[in-house]
Amino acid sequence: MEVSLNHPASNTTSTKNNNSAFFYFESCQPPSPALLLLCIAYTVVLIVGLFGNLSLIIIIFKKQRKAQNFTSILIANLSLSDTLVCVMCIHFTIIYTLMDHWIFGDTMCRLTSYVQSVSISVSIFSLVFTAVERYQLIVNPRGWKPSVTHAYWGITLIWLFSLLLSIPFFLSYHLTDEPFRNLSLPTDLYTHQVACVENWPSKKDRLLFTTSLFLLQYFVPLGFILICYLKIVICLRRRNAKVDKKKENEGRLNENKRINTMLISIVVTFGACWLPRISSMSSLTGIMRC
């Protein structure tokens, strides 16, 4: 069976007595300054993420209730998925990094990776729906116009699909003491300790799942979004090229440009930030290295 370690502090593969795919803790433990910086970074992300996302949700659903539209509701959904990661994943990762072993039980071991995968899916599919709405509004203004009701139905479908797509993560993670069995440390510090690891029947099964996940959760959605915004940019340039423009139309074009710039920035940031994580999940071996 292939087993890979979901451990925040990367370690090299042990070569003692077997071909275990776990990590050897002695040779790759991060130095204290690096560990401190990592924990500070996680803490800042946790605080800013919680405060920023919750504030945005409150503004959209409380202060701007009458001005709600398809895009604002989907942006609130993005914030909700990010808040879920802050609540369910980040602080567990901080403690796991500091302690080098898992203390939160089997259920939380499964849930943290599951929730993170669900959050990625919810975020990317929310961006897909937003791109569709912008496309219809700008490129095909006389066609179908997504409404607030459509947004809520879309969010329901997004969450259902994301929850189903991420089930293999919940099923594959478990607790084991194997990474600690062959340590040559002169201490019993890791005796009876366990790590939260990913366990697949075979490399082929893992490769099939991670490749499918990469396509469904990252490559195909971002490609679709890119095509939508490319057509939007082309359409806006053509409209700007027209000489006969009314001032109100010009103002509307500027507003669309502002919104599109913001949404494109969100997409680019999402793609850049999640690419390392997606790539590591989709690697052939699935094993983290130094």
Curated annotation (Swiss-Prot):
Cytoplasmic side: 61-83, 133-150, 228-258
GO molecular function, one term: neuropeptide binding
Protein name: Putative neuropeptide Y receptor type 6
Keywords, comma-separated and alphabetical: Disulfide bond, G-protein coupled receptor, Glycoprotein, Membrane, Receptor, Transducer, Transmembrane, Transmembrane helix
Glycosylation sites: 11
Keyword Glycosyltransferase carried by entry: no
Origin species: Homo sapiens (Human)
Disulfide bond residue pairs: 109-196
Subcellular location, record wording: Membrane
Tissues expressing the protein: Expressed in heart, skeletal muscle, gastrointestinal tissues, spleen, brain and adrenal glands.
Membrane association type: Multi-pass membrane protein
Extracellular membrane side: 1-39, 105-111, 172-206, 280-290
Protein family according to the UniProt entry: Belongs to the G-protein coupled receptor 1 family.
GO cellular component: neuron projection; plasma membrane
Physiological role: When expressed, is unable to bind pancreatic polypeptide (PP), neuropeptide Y (NPY), or peptide YY (PYY), suggesting that either it is functionally inactive or that it may have acquired a pancreatic polypeptide-independent function.
Transmembrane segments: 40-60, 84-104, 112-132, 151-171, 207-227, 259-279
